[in-house]
Amino acid sequence: MGSCVGKERSDEEDKIDFKGGNVHVISNKENWDHKIAEANKDGKIVIANFSAAWCGPCRVIAPVYAEMSQTYPQFMFLTIDVDELMDFSSSWDIRATPTFFFLKNGEQVDKLVGANKPELEKKVAALADSA
């Protein structure tokens, strides 16, 4: 378990890899709005992962998040790089990465700060059971 709080990003750092999953990378506000509208139309719960390429815990939890996106196709898994979308991320009051928001019909129903795999799995499973 862990989280990162602020660090300057170097240009050499790679993006976080969500290989093998069904994670949608959000690159701008319009893309976010489109995905939220799509999820609402389809009745899907959105799990939004605010992370950063330089954040070690974000990199550790990424394969878990990707795997969950395969296990729970009834949800929409999104990821937002806080450095690429600084203003948008600030509007969500991100204080540490990773931060996960759970949204139903566009409204926040839960939140998790940090790369706490057991807690993330518990929250996602609970949402799956209640859906």
UniProtKB/Swiss-Prot annotation:
Presence of the UniProt keyword Ribosomal protein in the record: no
InterPro entries per the UniProt record, alphabetical: Thioredoxin-like_sf (IPR036249), Thioredoxin_CS (IPR017937), Thioredoxin_domain (IPR013766), Thioredoxin_H-type-like (IPR050620)
Major localisation: cytoplasm
Keyword Transport: yes
UniProt KW keywords: Cytoplasm, Disulfide bond, Electron transport, Redox-active center, Transport
Family statement drawn from the similarity comment of this UniProt entry: Belongs to the thioredoxin family. Plant H-type subfamily.
Function: Probable thiol-disulfide oxidoreductase that may be involved in the redox regulation of a number of cytosolic enzymes.
PANTHER family registered for this protein in UniProt: THIOREDOXIN (PTHR10438), THIOREDOXIN H9 (PTHR10438:SF434)
Compartments, as annotated in UniProt: Cytoplasm
Membrane-crossing residue ranges in chain numbering: none
Stretches assigned to the Thioredoxin domain: 3-129
An annotated GO cellular component: cytoplasm
Organism, scientific name: Oryza sativa subsp. japonica (Rice)
Record-given protein name: Thioredoxin H4-1
UniProt xrefs under Pfam families: Thioredoxin
Active site: 55 (nucleophile), 58 (nucleophile)
